[in-house]
Amino acid sequence: MAKWGRQGNRRLTAVFIGVVVVLLAAACGGRQNQPTNDTGVAVTAQPAATAVGETELRITLTAADGRPVSGAAVQVRGDMSHAGMVPVLRTALPGDAGVYTAPFEWTMAGDWVLTVEFTLADGRTGTETFDFSIPTP
């Protein structure tokens, strides 16, 4: 059996130290955003009669006490319930009283899942999903 020798021990030590440094950096890295489950989310489409084509989504964020939540960053992802479709991605713009709007296009009839992801001003995050059914024209 071959001996490691000094050079082999140095390499092994260097690798070990490198692994420890990487693990410590990952463990001590940036602050993780804390999820929130006390923010209410509602989504409506304007016009209310959903059909294939352009619409405006209105996303309303409310605190647990019912107050509107302003200052959030809101992203919307629309996916068909079946595989093979390209998702529709939008950034919602802030409006009045915790209402955020996003232009959106229902690209085809069928069942859709809208995922709303938001980051509050204090860094907490949340995700809610909503089902929409778009009728065949």
Where are these regions (language model features)?
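Sec-dependent bacterial lipoprotein signal peptides
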Residues: 1-26
